């Protein structure tokens, strides 16, 4: 399983240009992309589809479809199996995890043979532990059970003012902090590539890792 975890950034300007250029090397012409939108409210689906379609327009003849939350679990599983790429969008990671578990999708996602991409909350949900650091939407930092697609945790939209939250959490798990415009790539559970600045937190230590061979 190959996974791309994007920290955040604007799909419609050049902020994610390097990330999508890297993805374009991995995605074959006429690939079928399925958007997993459960982290956000359905009133935002249209704007998400427009921005993601623009971002993928640099790739040749890819098709983009959105997985409707009203489908049954069986219908969702069929749709997932018919696609080459799963793209999990941003919003609230706890909502995303809840719907996936409620619909019984975790096993089929873990066994998916194509490329899985997480953006913001989508990336957060992929970890064994999903860390949600405090901000305007969350008054306190919380840790919930993630989907376990990777054995590390991530911080998205990373800025160094959250280091004080991440250091104590790094005693129990490895955390990769991914700023807007950056991404990490994982294959078979191991990181092998970073795009732009990436930081690791472990045992109360912080390192920049994009300059190293992952």
Task: Describe these PLM feature segments.
Residues 65-116:
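Flexible gly/pro-rich beta->alpha loop and the following alpha-helix that scaffold active-site loops
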Residues 42-76:
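Class I S-adenosyl-L-methionine
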Residues 33, 86, 120, 154, ...:
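A residue-level signal for conserved active-site and pocket-lining positions in enzyme catalytic cores
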Residues 46, 77, 99, 128-129, ...:
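Short, well-ordered secondary-structure micro-motifs
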Residues 28-33, 61, 83, 113:
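A general structural motif
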Residues 1-29, 39-50, 54, 132, ...:
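C-terminal and late-domain segments of enzyme folds
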Residues 35, 117-119, 177-178:
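A structural signal for short, well-ordered beta-strand segments and their strand-loop junctions
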Residues 95-160:
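Class I SAM-dependent methyltransferase SAM-binding "motif I" and its flanking Rossmann-like core
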